[in-house]
Amino acid sequence: RDLARKHANFYIIDAAKLAVQVGLGEKRTNNILQAAFFALTKVIPLDMAVEDMKKNNYNSYFKKAGQKIVDLNDKAVDLGISAAVKVEIPASWADAPDTPMAEPKNASAFVRDIVLPMDRQQGDKLPVSVFQKHGVLDGTWENGTSAFSKRGVATKVPKWNAESCIQCNRCAMCCPHAAIRPVLLAEEEKAQVPASFETVPAKGLGKDAPSYFFRMQVSPYDCLGCGVCLTACPANQSDKTADALVMTPFEEMKSEQANFDEVAMNDKYLKKDVINSKTVKNMQFAKPYFQFSAACAGCAETTYIKLLSQMVGDRMYAGNAAGCSSAISGGAPILPYCKDSQGRGPAWEHSLFEDNAEFAYGFFHAQDAIRKELLIRLESMKDAGIAPAEIEDYINNWNDGEKSRAVSDALIAALEKCEQTEDVSYILENREYLSKKSIWAIGGDGWAYDIGFGGIDHVMAQN
């Protein structure tokens, strides 16, 4: 409608197809698009633009890649000049009505009222009252909203070949966007999932593991097509076997989204009895609490953050430095940090200033002070005979990150049944601090080695 009303000249170009035709590969579209831009806009004489682009190709590629690559990029420039196709805009588009957009499943009121309008570039139309209604005037934000931004931007996504897969889960570990995940199903669960969710017997889970069925499931609409999973796959690097992952056109794979949403994203299918942090394989059966970020295709930073979230995500506090990691972690409205079915997940914060090491260290000291106060009160309550067994168990494990969650839950359940004295009420009001948190300062090399190095040096010197 806007195109018609503004009488815009509208052009399209299949740059990925042309890049393949040239021989550069579908992702090397820069010269094609740049040449098309200069041909259409004429911001400088086209001959001058072509000459400068080809000169830049030589300077950029000759020394490190040779004349062949220079020639391919020059050919891309020549193709791009005439590749744009004009689309005639019907006059009827000027009066095109708004089409109601289907709301995603499981979208909360916050997502419907705030996130989706912002994702449609309509955030400026939101009144202050809608933020007040949802209690986010202080800047807090519902997490997990990236799950509702199904962009579907990859031209090709990986297709799993069960016969060649060795079930090492390296592809899942290396995926920057948590868009490919291993799933285990018990025999009785196979009847609960779609018929298209084909599995094979799981292997290599450990000698005491139950018998499960395995599938590697991709999310076509969340995949960015970077190909990191293919590079990480041992079967793909072997000449002895067929590839376990094959890049396949998006149109052929988009039906797989239902399998991902209904099974791979469903916490009830998580198999906690095989999850451990001792092996790459078994760790990938854990839920990623960092998923579908807006990071660039193939981003390495998000791979580390995602893996960290799988290890300690349900009790993780993160202070984030300024940089790429803060932009992709806290760029409203799409937040990749999420919570599980029990409402647990990472708590994330970003300091306005370049003091992230000190900022996260403050998290640690605050947690330490609050939890020690709780411990003093609990010891007094134990002496008074209030829930002595549960308090004893908690005191013995309060500083163990893995065990403190379970003993904290048991303690809370016991205290809720007790007489609500001042101490009991205080403990229950501060229950979120009972379990030990895993506190992290996250940032890139600009923060760690340059502007924030003094803070890191200070924090490490305190230990």
Model-identified regions with their sequence ranges:
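Beta-sheet entry/capping signal
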Residues: 9, 157, 172-179, 215, ...
